[in-house]
């Protein structure tokens, strides 16, 4: 009986996470609809405000209005707050306010916090939450300070706001920029393709935000003693390194051939880092080769790591599936890595998440392509960007109809709350202590 009660508590915590994100999105949309949220002082249509709020809370970066020219200072501030809440997580922010007010965190709340940041255990969760919040603000502050000289040199005193906004947006893997003007909309960071300070700072912020809070904790606790890290941290760091270096080498030889060597290296690295849920771009994406776009779609679907500011199906999901395939080839019963066996339930979970993300990506792309009369490849790029909470686009987002925008809203939301979180929140728990059905083999492959 206690086991069932515990499961119900876990289920309610997943529902709280799902509903918490939805509540913040709706509230953000209502505020963005207000006339003083836009520079023109007009009421923003609800579907556009909802799209922007969803993109901010789900740290995606897809927009239907240029953030720099359409939204007022107030509107941009609201978007920044939504990005910060979405990056940290609704539950983490709620826990922060509870701790600041001196309230005691109950066991149920600790369990919810555990699920929200993918922590392995409830013990020490309050300490970990404090560590996450302090680390987040410190890293964002450092990123802001490093970018200050460049932005203040270009924009004067306004450069302080520019540096702060882009530091938070990069660390939270959001991809929102406020560099657009009425004459030059949706520029992202194309004007800084050869600027080492901006490129390197943004890339580091994206990577640190995307490797996960538990990996931070591991690194801070064990320093550079890689062997002492948790198995999950090792898998995350190795997978992340591979997913950065391999595509960067490909992009270097297949794209950006007209750039000087230094800019070509920066552009290749940047476009390798940013598809994994960040959404900034320094290059003109539509001009990249078809094979490069296909690689970027795969990177967008993978996304960041568990318990991070990033979305997507996660680096660990990809790693577990590949390791499981290797174990089959080697005729082993269990997948193995770093001298450890991977739990069979993790393999099943990884398969479920991968199938769910692929179906959302593919079905969404087909529907949008049919509704808009656009090439399927272009629409699949858009849906991969949405479900992976990336924010990269080939330029079609602002021109999409209401139906297609609503599809992207749903994909962004599902991509941020996470596949397993959504499944656990939606599917009721069943008592599995009864008799099992007869076992029968089925041929695959």
Give the label of every model feature segment.
Residues 1-445:
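Membrane-proximal intracellular helices of multi-pass ion channels
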